[in-house]
Amino acid sequence: WSLINVAGVDYEGPFTERTLEQIREVIRLNIEANLEMTRTILDLRDESKEFRLINVSSLASFYPMPVKAIYAASKRFLLDFSLALREELRPRGGTVTTLCPAGMPTTAGAICRINAQGLMGRITTKNVGYVAARTLDHALKGHSIYIPGLVNRILRMMGGLIPPTLVAHLIGHRWGGAYQRVMKTANIP
């Protein structure tokens, strides 16, 4: 038995500009749907057989992220849930691997946001096929977390050495600028 929880949604922009419906949608899809799918598959699984779960979180799960506050927090929930569930399932032959990629070029909007980040967007983004194949390799080896790309792993490590308030400030400055470039490109006031 295996399950890959890959669904997720984000509405970039300041929290105060998000509608309650947008906030609920992020929580429903990024958290509630994942928990429901996970619980359902665990209820159906044959405990005499190996079980692998892959949850797609985000590199954002490691940081407080202005302009992506709801998304980053929802992905942090998913990371913490996955690590805890991994320990619960370990004695019963289950493993949980959490994928934490940077931007993924999956839609025109995602590509626009990656491009708005300039060089950092280009060097942190990995090909979807590459990430999928490597994620499966890591899951089969029983790894707990997979962060694709050396630059992303270095960013994760550096983020752990800096006080969270400074991380939030630096990310807010960086993402705020990228967000403004996306809004200009899309002709959104």
Residue spans for each PLM region:
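C-terminal helical subdomain
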Residues: 98, 119-156
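Residue(s) in the substrate-gating loop at a strand-loop-helix junction
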Residues: 58
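Conserved NAD(P)H cofactor-binding loop of Rossmann-fold oxidoreductase domains
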Residues: 6-11
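Substrate-binding pocket helix/loop in short-chain dehydrogenase/reductase
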Residues: 14-15, 19-27
